[in-house]
């Protein structure tokens, strides 16, 4: 791989600062430029609460997008889960040794081709205080020597995906074809300008809906104990008493707030009211109360609307270069080096922050 001059970094920032004319729609096949908000994609994609507690707008996706192909609708399919009387989703928990694994777990269903750590496109710009607020925990518990369990209940609403590989001769939009012709092998400026004008990736699939989640914080010792117990017996193999005990305030170092991915105040109030658990004189709110409770899940089914992105698969623009392999190679070289530069310059890359 080639070494890159310092000028490339400045050039990239200067070129990418100009947004260009684009729409803003989450649609299959549309292209986006991940470098416009790399590390801060949650600003334009509703995936986790912003730090502003007051979020009246119910937008889901505000990232600029661009059509790259003509007549692609025939290759795309979508469906909605609306069957009454059942909960269209799942309940799951993830064990995280440290905060980086916690970030990774939250964005488990988000993939960006040619990125080894796609979650950093969303979390790379997080500092400890705003990361803690998004996750519903106190800042002291995201900086210390702790482990975590992420418990989440997800309600799927709409799913879209490409149902076939994009044909080699699928017609491109005229301006995309023009930009490809202007891309010069070995010319960094032309490659970065192409990314700015056309994009870096296209939407291959997505799922929208909403979720409730809660982060449980543990000392290393208690974390190892609960992880081994659940690993050996399985979640359904534990008694209800054991399950509640492991996720209780006397066993966990800290119980995070229950939050919704869309910061929906109505559903969060419902959770605080309906998911209270009382053990003698101790009262606390726990998402575990939903586990196996079909009545509560049915009530929650209608409350969790189509307000957030739950899964997203972004593919590189490789298909448009299939007849020009040398340009494809050059484009991907610039893309890969850009990713590495952004990763190195994000706050999460600096342990003192």
From Swiss-Prot:
Tissue/organ expression: Restricted to specialized categories of follicle cells localized at the poles of the egg chamber.
Subcellular compartments: Secreted
Keyword Ubl conjugation attached: no
Keyword Signal among UniProt keywords: yes
Name listed for the protein in its UniProt record: Torso-like protein
GO cellular component, one term: extracellular space
Keywords, ordered alphabetically: Developmental protein, Glycoprotein, Secreted, Signal
Residues making up the signal peptide according to the UniProt record: 1-19
Summary of the function given for this chain in its UniProt record: Probable ligand that binds to the torso receptor. Implicated in a receptor tyrosine kinase signaling pathway that specifies terminal cell fate.
GO biological process terms held by the UniProt record: embryonic pattern specification; germ cell development; maternal determination of anterior/posterior axis, embryo; pole cell fate determination; positive regulation of apical constriction involved in ventral furrow formation; positive regulation of multicellular organism growth; pupariation; terminal region determination
Gene: tsl
MF-aspect GO terms: signaling receptor activator activity; torso binding
Glycosylation sites (chain numbering): 71, 138, 187, 222, 264, 293
């Amino acid at each position: 791989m080639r070494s890159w001059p310092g000028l490339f970094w400045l050039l990239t920032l200067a070129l990418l600062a100009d947004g260009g004319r684009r729409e803003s729609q989450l649609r299959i096949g549309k292209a986006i430029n991940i470098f416009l908000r790399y590390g801060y994609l949650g600003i334009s994609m509703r995936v986790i609460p912003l730090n502003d507690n007051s979020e009246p707008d119910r937008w889901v996706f505000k990232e600029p997008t661009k059509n790259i192909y003509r007549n692609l609708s025939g290759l795309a399919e979508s469906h909605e889960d609306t069957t009454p009387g059942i909960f269209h989703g799942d309940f799951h928990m993830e064990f995280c040794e440290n905060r980086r694994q916690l970030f990774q777990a939250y964005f488990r269903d988000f993939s960006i081709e040619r990125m080894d750590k796609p979650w950093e496109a969303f979390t790379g710009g997080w500092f400890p205080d705003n990361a803690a607020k998004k996750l519903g925990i106190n800042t002291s518990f995201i900086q210390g020597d702790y482990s975590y369990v992420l418990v989440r209940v997800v309600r799927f609403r709409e799913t879209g995906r490409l149902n076939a590989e994009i044909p080699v001769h699928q017609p491109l939009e005229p301006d995309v074809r023009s930009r490809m012709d202007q891309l010069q092998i070995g010319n960094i400026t032309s490659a970065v300008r192409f990314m700015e004008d056309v994009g870096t990736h296209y939407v291959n699939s997505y799922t929208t809906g909403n979720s409730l989640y809660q982060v449980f914080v543990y000392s290393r010792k208690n974390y190892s104990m609960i992880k081994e117990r659940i690993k050996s017996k399985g979640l359904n193999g534990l008694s209800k008493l054991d399950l509640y005990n492991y996720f209780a305030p006397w066993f966990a170092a800290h119980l995070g707030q229950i939050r919704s991915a869309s910061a929906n105040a109505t559903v969060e109030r419902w959770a605080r009211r309906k998911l209270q658990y009382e053990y003698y004189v101790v009262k606390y709110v726990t998402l575990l109360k939903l586990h196996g409770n079909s009545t509560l899940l049915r009530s929650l089914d209608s409350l969790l609307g189509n307000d957030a992105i739950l899964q997203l698969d972004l593919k590189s623009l490789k298909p448009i270069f299939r007849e020009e392999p040398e340009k494809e190679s050059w484009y991907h070289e610039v893309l890969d080096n850009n990713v590495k530069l952004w990763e190195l310059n994000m706050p999460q890359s600096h342990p003192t922050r």
